[in-house]
């Protein structure tokens, strides 16, 4: 299990740009670590998203790709529906970045790839793109904007399965409005040759149900690829396919109604295979409330789904379900007994141990005057059997403003941990009299060791 005493920060303060807030995607390629960073806005050259490379031996970072700039137009000013007061303000005449983030990243060898290549999905108001690199130095665009629909803001997980690459769109921009978490195309896409930009729809929209408004996560388990939806009316659903024949494939539903919690389990935020079962982390955005759909407040749950369709409640709210009485096997209520853990954002398997990382909004309690001093920070919990969980950290490794974990990547050098840092909250806390170093802004990346390695590493997809 991870030993917090071995934690080493290998990147901080946004790694050269404190406006780089989210360590959004990550992969090991040709022995080096690649990191895609995201900015909450794209107001000028200072918000151009970057892909960085870390050399484990030298211990240094290199910027290998920076988003190009483009002239600002109406899409640059799109009103963000999640934020009061409208959309983004362009502050530079030099232009705005085409990409303000890189959301998905994986190593994959398609039909025309001579060797495995690094594929990256972008966040762009002009339609998310897929980038490809064969050497980790040059990145080329290998897709149409939005895979043919430039209203699609980005793509979440890039998941290899049975020689094909799968992804799902997230975010939409239409009629001057930006929706970061929804989509106008809740569909799984597939390609056996992404280098040629050839993509097909692998599913019906919403799997045939319009209430499945978004497909958040994909993960393989055995002979099936599983997909987790967001369904604000009835609760998340889990679907699976063997991906046989020509797309769109045949899919079957294996879990619905938010595993019996209905809309309080509106969305699947993370999935990973561990010891022959699929582990599912749920969540609601922000402070655990979706005001647009009048859902919440609620904290995240952790659920274990078996290949036969039966499920176990591990962390969550006791209840009766179609499977009978469900009592959390970890003996912990939603959010690992912490109501501020609104989302399970990342999971991975490293050295035979399951790691679960959260989004924690506790810092807002201070900003709302509910606590005397800033407190909070993401949680990481660990389990060797999927039922008995031990905390690795419950305070963001001492940083209350590190609200969440966006990357968990097992490597031979340790577990890579990348954060989502709300630097603007540091400014607000300082204005309210807190003893806060406002210069400590921007994402951070750390390596943490397990002194007793064993088992095969697996990571959940990004998004």
Where are these predicted regions, by residue range?
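Trp- and S/T/G-rich repeat-edge/linker motifs of beta-rich repeat architectures
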Residues: 1-21, 28, 32, 40-103, ...
